[in-house]
Amino acid sequence: MSISMDAGPGFAALQSWSSQVAAFGNSNQTVVDRVSPEMLHLIDAYWYQFPPMNPLWHALLGFTIGVLGFISMMGNGMVIYIFMTTKNLKTPSNLLVVNLAFSDFLMMCAMSPAMVINCYNETWVFGPFACELYGCAGSLFGCASIWTMTMIAFDRYNVIVKGIAAKPMTNNGALLRILGIWAFSLAWTVAPFFGWNRYVPEGNMTACGTDYLTKDWFSRSYIVVYSVFVYFAPLLLIVYSYYYIVQAVSAHEKAMREQAKKMNVASLRSSEAANTSTECKLAKVALMTISLWFMAWTPYLVINYTGILESAPISPLATIWGSLFAKANAVYNPIVYGISHPKYQAALYKRFPVLQCHSTTTDEASSVASGTTVMEEKPTA
C-alpha cells in the first residue's frame, strides 16, 4: 500500500522552512552574500566566516527600530514644539533641553527609516556613500547628545552648588555652548572621511559604523581617542557635577533638620526649602536620563573595544544589540522630561488634551519640576 501526501500550502511552507534552515547551516553561504558588489571593499574579511542571519532577527530588529523611531520622533518633536512655543519655558537653560531633543530627533529621522528598509532587504541597499553618511550621522548626533547632557549637568551644578553666587546663564551663553557642542561633534564625525578610521557596514549588514576590525593601529587610535573625549571624559565630568550636587543638597537638608529641632517644629517648609527639594528631585531625574544614555551606548563601546583589542569573537547578532541599544537612547529623553516637568505637562495637555489621563494638581506632583525652570525663577542677584 502506498501513502500519498498532498503537497498543500502547509507542506509547501514546511519545505520552504526546511530549505532556509539548510541554508543557514550551509558553510558555502555567508552573511555577506546579499551585499551588493560595490559595498564589498568596505567589508572586513572577518565577516565572511559567518552564515546568513535568520530572517526572523532582521524582521524583529526592523520592527523594533521602526517603533522606537516613531516614538522618538513624536516625543522629541513634542518637546521641541512645547518648549519653543511656551513663553515661561523659553529660558536659556531650556535651550539645552531643546538642543538635546533636536539631536535625538535628527538621529532617528536619519537612521530609523534606513535601517527598517535594510532589515526588510536583509542587507545594506543604499550604496557605500550612504553607508558613510549613515555612520557619520550616528556619530554626530550621539556626540552632540552626550555633550549637551554634560552642559545640562554643569548648569545644574552652577545653580544648585554655587547658589545665588553663580553667574546666571544667558541666551547668548546657551547658544554659544550649543554652537561649541555641534562644532566639536562635527570635528570628530568628519575625521574618518580624511583617513582616520572609516565608516563600514556592521556585522549584521543592515547598519554602518566605525571600523573596529581594522589591523591598522592608526585607525584603531581613532576609536580609543574618540571614546576618551566622547565617552569617558563626559562621564567623569557628569559624575563630578552630580557628586557635588548631591553633597550640597544633603548639607542643606541636614541644616534644615537641625534648625527645625532648635525651633521645636517638625520641619521648615519655606519657599527656599521647597525650591531646594525640587532641585534635588530634578537632579535625580537628570542623572537618571544621563545614566540611561550611557547604558544605551556602553554595549556599542564594548563591541568597538572588543574589535580593536581582538579580545573575544564578535558575531553579527551581537552587533544588532549594539545598534539597538545605541538608538534606544533617543527615546528616553522626551519620556523622562515629559514625566518630570509639570510646566511642560501643563503646556502639553493644553495643546493636546487627549493625552491627559489624570489630574496632577496635588502639591507633590507640582513639586517635581524641571531644574531648568527652577533655575530661571531663582533670583539672579
From Swiss-Prot:
Q: What does this protein do?
A: Visual pigments are the light-absorbing molecules that mediate vision. They consist of an apoprotein, opsin, covalently linked to cis-retinal. May play a role in photoperiodic photoreception.
State the compartments where it is located: Membrane
UniProt keywords, alphabetically: Chromophore, Disulfide bond, G-protein coupled receptor, Glycoprotein, Membrane, Photoreceptor protein, Receptor, Retinal protein, Sensory transduction, Transducer, Transmembrane, Transmembrane helix, Vision
The entry annotates sugar attachment on 28, 121, 204
Q: Please give the SUPFAM superfamilies that the UniProt record associates with this protein.
A: Family A G protein-coupled receptor-like
- Identify the coding gene: Bcop
Name of the protein in its database record: Ceropsin
- InterPro entries found in the cross-reference section: GPCR_opsins, GPCR_Rhodpsn, GPCR_Rhodpsn_7TM, Opsin, Opsin_lateye, Retinal_BS
Record GO terms (molecular function):
G protein-coupled receptor activity; photoreceptor activity
Which residues lie toward the Extracellular compartment?
1-62, 118-133, 195-221, 306-316
One Gene Ontology cellular component annotation held by this UniProt entry: membrane
Q: Note the Gene3D superfamilies from the entry.
A: Rhodopsin 7-helix transmembrane proteins
Q: Which residues cross the membrane?
A: 63-83, 97-117, 134-154, 174-194, 222-242, 285-305, 317-339
Membrane side Cytoplasmic: residue ranges: 84-96, 155-173, 243-284, 340-381
Q: Which family does it belong to?
A: Belongs to the G-protein coupled receptor 1 family. Opsin subfamily.
Organism, as annotated = Bombyx mori (Silk moth)
- Membrane topology per record: Multi-pass membrane protein
**Disulfide links within the chain:** 131-208
Chief localisation class: membrane
Q: Which GO terms describe its biological process?
A: phototransduction; visual perception
Tissue spec: Expressed bilaterally in dorsal and ventral anterior protocerebral cells and bilaterally in the dorsal posterior protocerebral and lateral posterior tritocerebral cells (at protein level). Expressed in the larval brain but not in the subesophageal ganglion or thoracic ganglion.
Give a yes or no for keyword Transmembrane helix in this entry. yes
